[in-house]
Amino acid sequence: KGLNLLLNEQHDKAIDSFIEAVQQDPDTSDLHFALGNLFRRRGEYERAVRVHEHLLKRADLPASERERAQHALAQDFMKAGLFDRAEEAFKALDGTVFDTEARLALLALHERSRDWRAAVEVAARLERSGSGSFATRIANYWCELALEADARQQTTEADAALQRAREAAPQAPRPLIMAGQRARARSDHREALQQWGTLMAAHPSAFNLVAVDYADSAKTIGEGPAALERLEALYRRGPTTD
């Protein structure tokens, strides 16, 4: 009956029919999941949520099926753009077979909302669990926190955040770029040259982003000719600067 209703586009009646079937026979939960997933694919997120929330309300649902329903519900919210509800739903999957997938989804949500501290925490947990290397991403999150602190004129906090970025990924280019930029902004051109010199050696292509500032800082402190020699040597190794 439920399939006939579905085929006839009577979706609400089809849901009721499937719900009744699931209540009468727990073995039909796979059909319930299939229906919910179908609605999600069709963009009918409210219906998908209804299906999966009903499953979660069932006291007799096995733990593995409950986790599956929670995961499906989190996906419903994510697809529907209900990000706060998606975050809570994914958090409920902590310690389940969907743990890693849920954390990756949470990381994407935190990046989207620019909640960098939460992103640091989730990425660190992913790395500790052996889900891959997140060092560069963690460094980028700390760099974002440093930028926000600078915007609030909280220099000490910005310094600390940038230091955390460098600790997370010592050879990542962005912390070196920012360290040089911040030094130049406070007219500490020698420190800027030191930071960018490290960048030049480790990431010649990224150095291209600050090559002009590097030359200007060198000229400011009377080291223009030496800087020009280094830039020419870098160019001879590979044309990465303009």
Place the predicted regions along the sequence by residue.
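Structural register within alpha-helical repeat arrays
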Residues: 1, 35, 73, 106, ...
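Alpha-helical segment of the N-proximal tetratricopeptide repeat
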Residues: 1-27, 41-44, 75-79, 144-152
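Short, charge-rich amphipathic alpha-helical segments embedded
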Residues: 17-46, 95-108, 172-177, 181
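Short coil turns that delineate tetratricopeptide repeat
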Residues: 26, 60, 64, 97-98, ...
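Start-of-helix register in tetratricopeptide repeats
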Residues: 30, 64-68, 101, 136-140, ...
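Structured, soluble extracytoplasmic/luminal domains of envelope-associated proteins
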Residues: 36-85
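Alpha-helical repeat scaffolds
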Residues: 49-57, 83-94, 118-129, 154-166, ...
